[in-house]
Amino acid sequence: MLSPNRFFLSATAGIVFSLLSSLCVAQETNALSLRTNIMVNDHRAFTIIPGDLDPDEPIPWVWYAPTLGKGLPGQHEIWMFNRLYANGIAIAGIDVGESYGNPKGVAIYQALYDKLTRENRFSRKPVLLGRSRGGLMLYSWAVRNPSSIGAIAGIYPVCNLISYPGLERAAPAFHMSAEELRTNLGKLNPVEMLAPLAAAKIPIFHLQGDNDKVVPLGPNSKLLADRINTMGGNAQIRVIKGQGHNLWNGWFTNEELIRFIMKFAKPSFD
């Protein structure tokens, strides 16, 4: 018969071993490696679909942008994608190149949405997750489709063409001169087109650094949130002091962000 002390040590060792085993399994899971590549309108797209989904329910999902070549999404997204995958939430995205949210890119986004929701049983209300210039791409689609969104999340997302990439650089993507683009900002620049998102009260949550020189807080996340909330909408910005436009791990392992995403992608999570 084991003495109380030996029993305690044995039980403790068992618990520790069990926890370590669970951690090893979690570390071995790389949702990004489970992606399936598909083609939509001659553009490369991907899906990551968890197993053991309810066949009678729409598949909850997160729409990630930007999807660019083999680099994005990449290693920095693995922690987030693993959390989503483990909680039964799919991830998808499509490569539209450096569209800056132009009408052609918006049309391709619509083609992806239609394919996934009509042919693959994906939910009609995904959570959009835009990182950096992915914000322009997703917001340009979102402002035109407020009834097709569960929520919008962002990691230092671009919201304003004037701020990034600037009108001179963006204009060729729109087949316009910079001056022509400036004249048409009211129907092409997401931060000028927010009324539908405010009216629909789409939940919005951004992480943004106060030292971002590439996508500054003021003309992007702050301007968007101020305008949305002034119109009665629902936008929150979590400002990270001292951080800029970088690959700090805290952007990609933020518990508040991932819980926001999961709450609106899969309401049963909350």
Each language-model region and where it sits:
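A domain-start/cap signature at the N-terminus of enzymes
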Residues: C24-E57, A170-P172, K266-D270
